[in-house]
């Protein structure tokens, strides 16, 4: 939180308008499979137990982080561009990610770029 607040302050100090992005969603199963690739069954099970028995815990943590971005933006009076919805509105949003289930691929980055370009007239 403090890192975001510091960055926002720095951007304003330079006379610029800070803008934040929400996070793209995460494909929890793809991410779990990616980080556990090469693990034996016992190690995979250990990771799953650490997650409380559900791979969905990964997505829940990710969404909590995303919600904190919305809170920071609101408290700091910063415009936040919602890219989360751009992904979730696609039935096949998982196809917009690399094999790790977290980082957008080229098509996912294009979706982010389009969302930013569409929002910019309201920012400047």
List PLM regions with ranges.
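Alpha-helical cap/lid subdomain in secreted, periplasmic
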Residues: 1-124
């Amino acid at each position: 939180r403090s890192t975001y607040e510091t960055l926002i302050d720095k951007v304003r100090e330079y006379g610029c308008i800070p803008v934040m992005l929400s996070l793209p969603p995460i494909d929890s199963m793809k991410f779990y499979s990616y980080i556990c690739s090469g693990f034996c069954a016992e190690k995979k099970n250990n990771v799953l137990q650490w997650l409380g028995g559900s791979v969905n815990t990964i997505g829940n943590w990710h969404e909590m982080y995303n919600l904190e971005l919305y809170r920071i933006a609101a408290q700091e009076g910063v415009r936040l561009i919602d890219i989360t919805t751009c992904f979730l509105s696609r039935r096949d949003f998982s196809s917009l990610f690399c094999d790790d289930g977290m980082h957008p691929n080229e098509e996912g980055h294009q979706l982010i770029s389009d969302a930013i370009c569409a929002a910019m007239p309201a920012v400047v």
